[in-house]
């Protein structure tokens, strides 16, 4: 038996029974002459050895559904997570960051470890013209022959999913690209019943996905009702300021309720076209709005304001973003 420090605590363990993937035992980790890479491998191996059950990790987007899920955990209606992760793109509206700061205090009060991860500021990164690689945004494209298209989306993976998965690996003790057949973690997603099409299989065999709101058949509106009934402040909409997936309803909300964010989106719409032109790698012209005109020139009036009668009521099918960024 040997005393080994795992997660800051002294534990007595038979180190010869904790094999590393290389075939060495954990006892070898405490010998001399190790490289930095071997040190990291040993640290992560010790972390995995200390786990008694898979970690429960809440993917927090700070929007309506994931916020409601967090509050339900606080109220004891859903099993609490071991960790909470928020992927910060650096380009959320100010009210979202203010809301996130309040959630951080709630998590502190209830001893929920919180991790804010980031791959950088997406707005600044995609405007670079120094020849370095930049992620593609799912902008609407006007082709030279005046046909329409849509650019491939890379922003979600690079600024949302990858940073979160990197933190997942760190928490369960896996190196980059390291595989495991063990169930090491479960990611809990705040996806509501009306967004059931967003359910996905986990990308790795050591990971499971859980969708409590879908299991309980709770819709987005029911989340808002739950927050109101329990005395919680209604969460803001969480999405990058210049996300092209916004509906006209959401662009109107941004313009009418967050004028600074709207002005930022309008500026970015012009700046992004200029950056793409300078880089010279695309023959098509990008736009944030599906109309293929600058955002500040788009007619965002409702059907009623346009004098167009809708059988199902005003903009019945244009009320909510489906949040298809995947988080």
List each language-model region with its residue ranges.
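Nucleotide-activated chemistry modules centered on ATP-dependent adenylation/adenylyltransferase
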Residues: 29-30, 42-327
């Amino acid at each position: 038996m040997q005393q080994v420090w795992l997660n800051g605590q002294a534990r007595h363990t038979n180190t010869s029974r904790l094999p590393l993937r290389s075939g060495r035992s954990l006892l070898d980790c405490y010998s001399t002459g190790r490289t930095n890479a071997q040190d990291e491998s040993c640290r992560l191996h010790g972390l995995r050895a200390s786990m008694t059950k898979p970690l429960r990790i809440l993917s927090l987007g700070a929007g309506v559904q994931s916020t409601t899920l967090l509050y339900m955990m606080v109220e004891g209606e859903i099993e609490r997570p071991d960790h909470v992760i928020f992927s910060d793109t650096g380009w959320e509206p100010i009210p979202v960051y203010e809301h996130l700061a309040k959630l951080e205090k709630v998590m502190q009060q209830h001893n929920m470890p919180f991790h804010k991860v980031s791959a950088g500021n997406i707005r600044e990164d995609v405007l670079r013209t120094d020849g370095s690689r930049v992620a593609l945004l799912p902008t609407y494209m006007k082709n030279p022959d005046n046909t329409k298209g849509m650019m491939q989306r890379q922003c979600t993976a690079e600024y949302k999913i990858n940073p979160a998965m990197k933190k997942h690996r760190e928490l369960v003790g896996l190196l980059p690209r390291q595989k495991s057949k063990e169930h090491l973690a479960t990611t809990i997603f705040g996806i509501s019943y009306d967004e059931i099409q967003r359910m996905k299989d986990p990308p790795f065999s050591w990971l499971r996905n859980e969708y409590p709101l879908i299991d309980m058949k709770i819709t987005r509106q029911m989340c808002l009702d739950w927050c109101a009934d329990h005395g919680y402040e209604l969460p803001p909409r969480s999405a990058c300021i210049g996300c092209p997936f916004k509906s006209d309803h959401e662009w109107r909300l941004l313009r009418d309720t967050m004028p600074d964010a709207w002005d930022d989106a309008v500026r970015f719409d012009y700046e992004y076209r200029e950056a793409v032109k300078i880089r010279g790698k695309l023959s098509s012209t990008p736009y944030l709005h599906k109309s293929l005109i600058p955002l500040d020139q788009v007619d965002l009036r409702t059907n009623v304001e346009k004098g167009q009668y809708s059988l199902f009521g005003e903009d019945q099918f244009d009320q909510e973003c489906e949040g298809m960024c995947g988080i």
